[in-house]
């Protein structure tokens, strides 16, 4: 059992006979009245999103989730294909299940696929990835006195804010949990 006050982004639990993953949460302590937890939940089976408010002391049944590392192979436009390294079985997943992880995945990279009762419902990119910058505006000399950032497009198409000294062709490390630039490699 997990209490509603412990809900965080990515936690999966069973509620009202359905399984939900927390996509967003806010713990609210109003000046008057009791505290509550406002959440945005995604149904792992249907993909539907609901807003739900919980009392922080409310107990929820934690769902049993299987996590399996798989290799991202390719995309055919609508579906993304992942391969199990043990059985070599390929699993197609739609964009709704892949979510934001695809912004950081190149072909042949490994990602964690989450399963509930044998059905894949979510993809988790590695915490840190190294990607090459394909386009960014050149930094102007003298612009580096402050900690200013500029947008840069990486090889997967994601746009990341990077420091002024980063140029086209540089390889950078990105924290996929926050989408932030970490360092130049």
Swiss-Prot record:
Its main location: cytoplasm. GO terms for cellular component: cytoplasm. Pathway: Protein biosynthesis; polypeptide chain elongation. PANTHER family: ELONGATION FACTOR P, ELONGATION FACTOR P (EF-P) FAMILY PROTEIN. Involved in peptide bond synthesis. Stimulates efficient translation and peptide-bond synthesis on native or reconstituted 70S ribosomes in vitro. Probably functions indirectly by altering the affinity of the ribosome for aminoacyl-tRNA, thus increasing their reactivity as acceptors for peptidyl transferase. It comes from the Bacteria. It is found in: Cytoplasm. Keywords: Cytoplasm, Elongation factor, Protein biosynthesis. The gene is efp. It comes from Clostridium botulinum (strain Eklund 17B / Type B). Belongs to the elongation factor P family. One of its GO terms (molecular function) is translation elongation factor activity. Disulfide bonds: none annotated. HAMAP family: EF_P. The lineage of its organism: Bacteria, Bacillati, Bacillota, Clostridia, Eubacteriales. GO terms for biological process: peptide biosynthetic process. This is Elongation factor P. Pfam families: EFP, EFP_N, Elong-fact-P_C.
